[in-house]
């Protein structure tokens, strides 16, 4: 079960309970800041991360708007900072062409292509969260926690009753596509080089990202 208790500033994931660093009001206040202040605070966080890891960092670069803004802000401070792009084979040609316009970009490739991933693990459907819960119910049946997302027990964004028919889908479903094709190459690169990634995400993109930000803020050391 995932919930937040604003008064006590607690956040719970399953049986694990951690104190949150911020409240939803903190987030709303920061989101209302003028652009200049947001840029200043963001670059301060980049400097903190860079210094904490003694410069052994890189920008995780997908060619999308969020990581492009991040790379621009980072290179205003550290012009030679490396960017790392994972070429999954699923990117639009325009994205690949756009990434090639930047210098000092390391291109990585996953060891498995998309066809191999869906054959071994299953299709990603709806979202990673939905795919994960469907996979767990398919594998473990009604005795697992995920079943509560489909029988009405869980509420809010955890209620997935409308996707319940997918449990009976005649094909495998999994959330492993992103892990295998994007996260794993990045982790292997980090292990090989000793570098830590700078990742640009927006809290307003999902409830999960809001929860992550409430718990740890912008940087997670």
Residues of each region from the PLM?
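ATP-dependent adenylation/nucleotidyltransferase module used to activate substrates
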Residues: 11-221
């Amino acid at each position: 079960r995932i919930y937040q208790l604003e008064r006590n500033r607690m956040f719970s994931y399953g049986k694990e309970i951690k104190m949150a660093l911020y409240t939803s009001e903190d987030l709303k206040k920061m989101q209302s800041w003028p652009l200049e202040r947001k840029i200043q605070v963001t670059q301060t966080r980049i400097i903190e991360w860079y210094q904490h890891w003694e410069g052994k960092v890189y920008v995780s670069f997908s060619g999308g708007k969020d990581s492009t803004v991040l790379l621009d802000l980072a290179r205003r401070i550290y012009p030679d900072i490396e960017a790392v792009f994972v070429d999954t084979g699923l990117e639009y040609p325009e994205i690949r062409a756009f990434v090639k316009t930047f210098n000092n970009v390391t291109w990585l490739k996953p060891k498995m292509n998309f066809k191999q991933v869906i054959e071994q693990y299953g299709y990603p459907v709806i979202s990673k969260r939905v795919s994960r819960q469907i996979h767990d119910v398919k594998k473990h049946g009604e005795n697992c926690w995920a079943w509560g997302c489909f029988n009405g027990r869980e509420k809010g964004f955890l209620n997935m009753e409308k996707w319940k028919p997918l449990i009976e889908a005649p094909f495998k479903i999994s959330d492993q596509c992103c892990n295998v094709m994007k996260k794993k190459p990045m982790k292997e690169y980090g292990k090989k080089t000793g570098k830590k990634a700078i990742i640009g995400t927006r809290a307003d993109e999902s409830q999960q990202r809001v929860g992550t930000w409430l718990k740890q803020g912008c940087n997670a050391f």
